């Protein structure tokens, strides 16, 4: 039985990991497409219009792959978690249905109009079509994260005598504190991925001395949006999410921070390897008191460690949760450093000559995908109840 449960989890983890490669690009890319089209309306410079159409074609391919990989994921709710689907379908079925009804049709309809309907629509309606694709993309994220937020922090429901969960407060479901903070964090993370992809394509064009005009446009746009998103994904949205994890899932919070013992003046671990046998961190590098400060804005406050919780309430794989969180934070720090340096050179008007930095930006794009996936691993590996 335990083996079958593990296999079900591994199968679902593989399916949803592969699926999320695609939405994390489309959600952020839709905003950049709207920006390019808006810039064209303001300046009438044709390169912005062509950039918008070019990236919408990339969006369409990723959107299609997202749909194809998302269908088996929904099937696996029934095949792998049949009892969960039976009992909670009255709630999660509604949010998933709204995602399909509102978001999917909004995106799929206006993608075609944007790619092929420029001459028919005129530029203002063409911009509106792009904006509606963006709206559908972000609404899709909202409904999916609403589903996940209910699983993280169940609200707005009652349990019937037959054990079924039914929704009794629609607005409470969509004002779930977990939903609001997770959505903002997720969208900034998606914008990081799309910004690095756009910037990396621009860097590649410049390095190859091909389509230099568009290479400079893509690189400049990716750097500006990437720096903005890289900062916001850590503060305030990442800070908000960590505090919500502490409030709602304190055992998972202790595990991801590598805090084995309850402490006043709790330290923030930078590096270290969890030793589950000894219940400690090996080769630890930490900042004293800083975890208490980030959590409560006071250095001497108490943070519960894993020793404060029964073993059955702890995440099943503490090292994986710990490493996922710390690698994600480490990559986020690298993103800020690289984008800040690139923005500095952009301000100095010599970014396009920095070949070493262009190589770094180009090669970092896959790591933006990895950081996004690790963020979801952190959310799901420690999820309660």
Per-segment meaning from a language model:
Residues 1-385:
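Polytopic transmembrane helical bundles with strong interfacial aromatic enrichment
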């Amino acid at each position: 039985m335990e083996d079958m449960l593990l296999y079900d989890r591994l199968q679902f983890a593989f399916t949803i990991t592969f699926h999320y490669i695609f939405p994390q690009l489309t959600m952020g890319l839709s905003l950049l497409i709207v920006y390019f089209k808006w810039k064209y309306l303001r300046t009438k410079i044709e390169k912005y219009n062509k950039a918008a159409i070019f990236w919408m074609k990339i969006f369409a391919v990723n959107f299609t792959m997202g749909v194809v990989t998302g269908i088996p994921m929904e099937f696996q709710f029934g095949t792998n978690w049949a009892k969960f689907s039976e009992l909670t379908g009255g709630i999660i079925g509604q949010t998933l249905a709204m995602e399909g009804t509102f978001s999917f049709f909004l995106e799929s309809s206006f993608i075609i109009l944007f790619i092929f309907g420029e001459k028919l629509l005129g530029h203002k309606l063409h911009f509106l079509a792009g904006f509606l694709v963006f709206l559908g993309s972000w609404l899709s994220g909202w409904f999916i994260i609403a589903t996940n937020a209910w699983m993280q922090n169940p609200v707005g429901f009652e349990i019937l005598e037959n054990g079924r969960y039914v929704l009794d407060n629609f607005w409470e479901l969509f004002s779930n504190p977990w939903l609001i903070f997770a959505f903002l964090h997720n969208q900034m993370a998606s914008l990081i991925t799309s910004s690095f992809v756009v910037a990396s394509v621009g860097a590649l064009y410049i390095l190859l001395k091909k389509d230099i005009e568009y290479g400079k446009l893509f690189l400049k746009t990716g750097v500006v949006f990437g720096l903005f998103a890289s900062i916001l994904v850590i503060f305030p949205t990442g800070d908000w999410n960590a505090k919500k994890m502490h409030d709602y899932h304190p055992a998972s919070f202790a595990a991801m921070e590598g805090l084995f013992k309850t402490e006043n003046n709790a330290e923030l671990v930078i590096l270290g390897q969890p030793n589950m046998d000894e219940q400690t961190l090996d080769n630890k590098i930490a900042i004293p008191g800083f975890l208490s400060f980030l959590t409560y804005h006071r250095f001497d406050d108490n943070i519960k460690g894993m020793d404060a919780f029964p073993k059955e309430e702890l995440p099943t794989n503490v090292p994986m949760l710990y490493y996922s969180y710390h690698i994600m934070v480490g990559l986020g720090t690298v993103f800020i450093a690289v984008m800040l340096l690139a923005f500095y050179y952009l301000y100095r008007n010599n970014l396009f000559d920095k070949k070493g930095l262009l190589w770094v930006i180009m090669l970092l794009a896959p790591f933006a995908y990895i950081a996004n996936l690790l963020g979801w691993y952190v959310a799901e590996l420690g999820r309660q109840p």
